[in-house]
């Protein structure tokens, strides 16, 4: 999917049309042929990742077979809710809106005396509650949940374990955030969504790049070089500061456990996920 001449130019350049066709084929194969589903359900945050996922799902399955789900919390941005609705209306897909406020606050009120929790804990509860909704609606509509996480977030561990990473198929998981933006523009995701700063929308005013302290343009390129085996000093020589490289490398290393299934203590030669693998797992 990488465009020609990327070593001499932009290492993150992609052939957008080839990527689109491959991901549409991936969704058809993984949902329909391998798992026997004809429908998919996508959680729509109003951001570029979930919007692109919905566009690809519609091309793969047909608009009548894609369900877009909005799951606001009481502190969620009204703009995010509106942008998710714009995607629903643009694609003409069925939609469901489930307010998760009562579920999240109801739980926290039982484990905290004042019903309050630090922002990270509350955000994790929100993310996991959204997965409860998606998987329940999956059972209701017989529609497979489709993941929306990009490669940058996965490599940085910028997601809630057993939440954002839970859907069984993820078309964007091998695309850096900057590549997601390029592909989203190519397939026609509304410009208002492409222009706004990325945010998990878990805390009012929160932005992803604000949490990182570094832009996606830099993060993606640093990650690109690190996962190809470059040493930090070599990445610095590419035009980044030692602090920027150390920050990204530190997150890449410290969050590796989040990109794996639970670690099993092996007791036999048939340990699931270690020795017992189907051909498709290799």
Residue ranges and their predicted role:
Residues 47:
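Conserved G/P- and acidic residue-centered "switch" motifs that form tight phosphate/ATP-binding loops
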Residues 1-42, 52, 56-59, 64-70, ...:
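ATP/NTP-dependent adenylation/nucleotidyl-transfer catalytic domains that generate, transfer
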């Amino acid at each position: 999917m990488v465009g020609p001449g990327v070593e001499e130019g932009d290492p993150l350049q992609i052939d957008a049309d080839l990527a689109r066709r491959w991901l549409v084929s991936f969704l058809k194969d993984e949902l329909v042929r391998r798992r026997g589903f004809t429908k998919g359900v996508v959680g729509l945050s109003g951001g570029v990742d979930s919007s692109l996922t919905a566009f690809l799902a519609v091309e793969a399955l047909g608009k009548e077979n894609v369900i877009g789900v909005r799951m606001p919390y009481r502190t969620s941005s009204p703009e995010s809710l509106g942008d998710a609705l714009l995607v629903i209306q643009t694609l003409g897909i069925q939609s469901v809106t489930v307010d998760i406020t009562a579920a999240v606050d109801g739980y926290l009120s039982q484990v905290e005396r004042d019903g309050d929790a630090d922002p990270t804990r509350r955000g994790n509860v929100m993310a996991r509650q959204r997965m409860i909704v998606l998987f329940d609606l999956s059972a209701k509509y017989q529609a497979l949940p489709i993941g929306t996480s990009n490669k940058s977030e996965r490599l940085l561990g910028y997601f809630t374990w057993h939440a954002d990473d839970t859907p069984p198929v993820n078309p964007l998981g091998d695309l850096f955030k900057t590549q997601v933006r390029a592909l989203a523009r190519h397939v026609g995701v509304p410009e208002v969504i492409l222009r706004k700063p990325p945010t998990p929308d878990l805390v009012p005013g929160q932005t992803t790049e604000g949490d990182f302290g570094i832009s996606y343009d830099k993060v993606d390129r640093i990650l690109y070089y690190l996962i190809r085996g470059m040493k930090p000093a070599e990445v610095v020589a590419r035009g980044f500061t030692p602090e920027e490289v150390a920050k990204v490398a530190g997150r890449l290393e410290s969050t590796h456990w989040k990109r794996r299934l639970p670690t099993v203590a092996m007791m036999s030669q048939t340990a699931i996920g270690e020795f017992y693998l189907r051909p498709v797992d290799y």
